């Protein structure tokens, strides 16, 4: 199949009530390479010999941005279907079709049925469940091959983060330091705050990226809390721009050290002042 794509019909019940095709979304399931999970029963991560673990393809990401794709012969291509029932929907059983096409040529009609109950959920922003799924804007930039923090980057993130907001997400994941988890992920987390040591030895901080990120996440409906990482990164190594040498430098220091207390004392004083000015101090952790 050279141009696999899909669409929905309206869904109707026997009384003539309908659910618009706009209530339905779908995405192609993509595959990634992985290895055996928890083979040794220890339930831990860390270094291990790759030859001891078998590799395999697993269905993982749901690509909601891809509108069509080619599918080789004798392979399976799943499609994930999601239905967002509007609060105004009349209870009942609705029937409709998922149309599978190759370009403009119809391949298959899949009959679907959904039962709408009389119970009604509030809007996701009103849900009490404290959902905290970490976000990685860096992975999105790499996946869609767009410059980090560009308008194209934010445009690519918006539908993804809106899906997260619609799931009831409450927390914004923000990073204050370079590689807080020592870059163990495919796309390491960088700092959203620029740390600068001036030529006179004092500290200055630029929150431009942090502010843009938080404001963007709030614009999609995720605004209850900001979790900031990390005062104690795995490597206890902190990156900063050194004005005296016009270069990026690293300092290794730990809680209790004079250097640690000096730099973090300056940072927290500056950061708390900035958060209060933005009105975010009480929701930041």
Regions found by a protein language model. Name each.
Residues 1, 89-91, 105-107:
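A cross-taxa feature marking solvent-exposed loop/turn segments within ectodomains of secreted
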Residues 1-81:
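Surface-exposed binding patches on compact interaction domains or structured appendages
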Residues 81-90:
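Extracellular/luminal low-complexity segments enriched in Ser/Thr/Pro
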């Amino acid at each position: 199949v050279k141009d696999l794509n899909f669409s929905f019909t309206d869904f109707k019940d026997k009384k003539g009530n309908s659910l618009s095709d706009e209530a339905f979304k779908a995405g192609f399931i993509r595959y990634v390479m992985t290895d055996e999970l928890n083979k040794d029963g220890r339930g831990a991560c860390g270094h291990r010999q790759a030859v001891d673990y078998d590799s395999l393809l697993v269905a993982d990401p749901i690509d909601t941005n891809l509108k069509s794709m080619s599918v080789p012969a004798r392979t399976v291509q799943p499609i994930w279907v999601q239905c967002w029932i509007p609060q105004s929907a009349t209870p009942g059983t609705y029937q409709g079709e998922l149309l599978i096409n190759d370009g403009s040529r119809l391949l298959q009609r899949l009959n679907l049925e959904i039962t709408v109950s009389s119970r009604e959920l509030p809007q996701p922003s009103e849900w009490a469940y404290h959902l905290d799924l970490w976000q990685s804007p860096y992975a999105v930039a790499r996946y869609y091959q767009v410059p980090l923090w560009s308008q194209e980057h934010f445009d690519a993130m918006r539908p993804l983060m809106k899906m997260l907001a619609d799931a009831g997400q409450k927390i914004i994941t923000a990073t204050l330091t370079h590689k807080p988890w020592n870059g163990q992920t495919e796309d390491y987390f960088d700092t959203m705050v620029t740390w600068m040591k001036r030529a006179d030895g004092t500290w200055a901080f630029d929150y431009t990226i942090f502010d843009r990120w938080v404001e963007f996440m709030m614009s999609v409906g995720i605004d209850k809390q900001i979790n900031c990482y990390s005062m104690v990164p795995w490597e206890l190594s902190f990156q900063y721009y050194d004005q005296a040498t016009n270069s990026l430098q690293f300092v290794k220091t730990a809680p209790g050290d004079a250097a640690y207390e000096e730099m973090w004392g300056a940072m927290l004083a500056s950061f708390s002042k900035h958060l209060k000015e933005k009105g975010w101090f009480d929701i930041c952790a």
